[in-house]
């Protein structure tokens, strides 16, 4: 008599577990591994995980080690102004050499210049699932992942693209008509990858203009949009959006002005703009604050760059004009923190052996692989958006998916790098006309002193997520909802310890992370 429960009961039990626990179950027996690798189960798990997206943190230690944590995202950030949550540890990598730890797409992390094992001599580029710790894989047909390699300052035909999941993965050359230098990670909205870049005019090298590069992945074509200065791109209700911010002064009081642009018409390039101003006394920051993204609930998220004793993330709702503070506990102290909003745990990628393959080994090391280089894409055409104004702080700019439109977020902070923060979001309303809308908000957080805050993205619910970029305790994540104009601060516990002698450990955070069970391996 077979005592093993039927598949329906096994599914019901496993669907209640996090992806890491499910991945461990696959090691129990071949029978359970076969059940967990079935497409119907992995799709069910992904659907359930998508309904509960998380905040993903990538922490980079001073010794080069990379760690991944995640925490829950508040569902109703406007109900409370301050929260404290604990972070869950997932996996650790031996050495991440690159300055920027990773880029993110659909539950997968791209890591450049890393050593998978402490005994590895070769430095590789790899794609992994941060929940299971497994590397490299593919989705079924019509759910392809691709890696876009943009070479600079080489010629326009030196760019390459790689499709994951094919039997013979190889780099193919791809033509881009515009010589440009990508300077921030990209965002994928409805099969189009958007990223910010500086256009390089060959006859006049010292002259610069700024563009949003639009890459249609199905047709592998580029188009371009001229835009103003953004600090961060977001997905605002399926539209491309951009966020910018600056500090000001009103009646003798220092203010934080946040602007958000939304691309209302892609063809005409028409944008709408939203502005919001906050008073400085509501938030106190002695650190760099950056908009890191927007949640699926349309909240702009502000985060610190480095983890310290107190790590905060702020959620600002532009519609309600509310600001919520979240203290993140558990991140390591003195670490660089990268924050990603709306992370969805996904186990959708299968490969035969764990830690066996790296995507690229020392491939054109002097050139750039753009942020957002791993994308879940179905179409392959592209366009370019131009940014004509000079961007004083391009590193503070983030692309977002704002309600299905490409958006850009810019975060401005005071000289002392404290709250209030001014967040400017620009959304591409009309792609053809390159018309943008702009929204400006000032973010305030009460009685919180945090350093090194950055925008990591926008959640599927429309919250812009900001996090500390180091893992010093306490660790905070901030959810800003442009619609409500609210900022929620969430303290994440469990990410790190107090290490007085260590240098800053960096943290990378990802929004709307979905656990996926299909990224597993066979022995």
UniProtKB/Swiss-Prot annotation:
- State the name under which the record lists this protein: Putative F-box protein At1g30925
Q: Which InterPro entries match?
A: F-box-assoc_dom_typ3 (IPR013187), F-box-assoc_interact_dom (IPR017451), F-box-like_dom_sf (IPR036047), F-box_dom (IPR001810)
Enumerate the spans annotated as F-box domain. Answer: 4-44
């Amino acid at each position: 008599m077979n005592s093993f429960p039927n598949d329906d009961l096994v599914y019901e039990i496993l669907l209640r577990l996090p992806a890491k626990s499910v991945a461990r179950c696959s090691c129990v027996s071949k029978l359970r591994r076969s059940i967990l690798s079935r497409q119907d189960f992995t799709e069910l798990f992904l659907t359930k995980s998508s309904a509960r997206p998380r905040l993903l943190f990538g922490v980079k230690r001073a010794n080069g080690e990379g760690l991944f944590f995640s925490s829950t995202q508040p569902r109703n950030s406007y109900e409370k102004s301050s929260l404290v949550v604990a972070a869950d540890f997932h996996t650790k990598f031996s050495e991440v050499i690159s300055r920027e730890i990773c880029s993110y797409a659909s539950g997968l992390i791209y890591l450049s210049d890393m050593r998978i094992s402490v005994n590895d001599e070769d430095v590789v580029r790899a794609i992994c699932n941060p929940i299971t710790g497994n590397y490299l894989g593919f989705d079924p047909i019509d759910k392809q992942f691709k890696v876009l390699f943009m070479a600079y300052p080489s010629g326009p035909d030196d760019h390459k693209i790689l499709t994951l999941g094919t039997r013979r993965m190889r780099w193919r050359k791809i033509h881009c008509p515009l010589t440009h230098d990508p300077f921030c990670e990209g965002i994928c909205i409805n099969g189009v990858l958007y990223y910010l870049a500086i256009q390089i005019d060959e006859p006049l090298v010292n002259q610069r203009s700024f563009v949003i590069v639009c890459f249609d992945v199905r047709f592998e074509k580029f188009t371009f949009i001229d835009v103003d200065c953004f600090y961060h791109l977001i997905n605002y209700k399926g539209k491309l959006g951009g966020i910018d911010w600056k500090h000001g002064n009103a009646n003798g009081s220092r203010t934080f002005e946040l602007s958000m642009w939304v691309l209302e018409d892609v063809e005409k390039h028409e944008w709408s703009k939203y502005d919001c101003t906050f008073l400085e006394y509501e938030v106190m920051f002695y650190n760099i604050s950056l908009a890191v993204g927007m949640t699926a609930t349309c909240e702009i998220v502000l985060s610190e760059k480095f983890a310290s004793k107190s790590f905060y993330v702020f959620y600002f709702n532009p519609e309600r004009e509310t600001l919520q503070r979240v203290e993140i506990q558990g991140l390591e102290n003195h670490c660089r923190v990268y924050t990603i909003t709306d992370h969805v745990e996904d186990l959708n990628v299968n490969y035969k052996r764990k830690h066996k393959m790296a995507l690229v080994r020392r491939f054109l090391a002097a050139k750039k692989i753009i942020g957002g280089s791993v994308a879940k894409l179905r179409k392959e055409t592209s366009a370019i958006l131009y940014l004509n104004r000079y961007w004083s702080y391009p590193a503070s700019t983030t692309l977002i998916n704002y309600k299905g439109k490409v958006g850009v977020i810019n975060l401005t902070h005071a000289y002392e790098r404290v709250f209030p923060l001014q967040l400017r979001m620009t959304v591409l309303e009309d792609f053809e006309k390159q018309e943008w809308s702009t929204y400006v908000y000032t973010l305030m957080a009460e009685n919180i002193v945090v350093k090194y805050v950055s925008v990591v993205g926008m959640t599927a619910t429309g919250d812009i997520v900001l996090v500390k970029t180091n893992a010093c305790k306490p660790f905070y994540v901030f959810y800003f909802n442009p619609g409500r104009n609210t900022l929620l601060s969430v303290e994440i516990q469990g990410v790190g310890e107090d290490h007085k002698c260590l240098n800053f450990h960096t943290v990378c955070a990802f929004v709307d992370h979905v656990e996926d069970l299909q990224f597993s391996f066979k022995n």
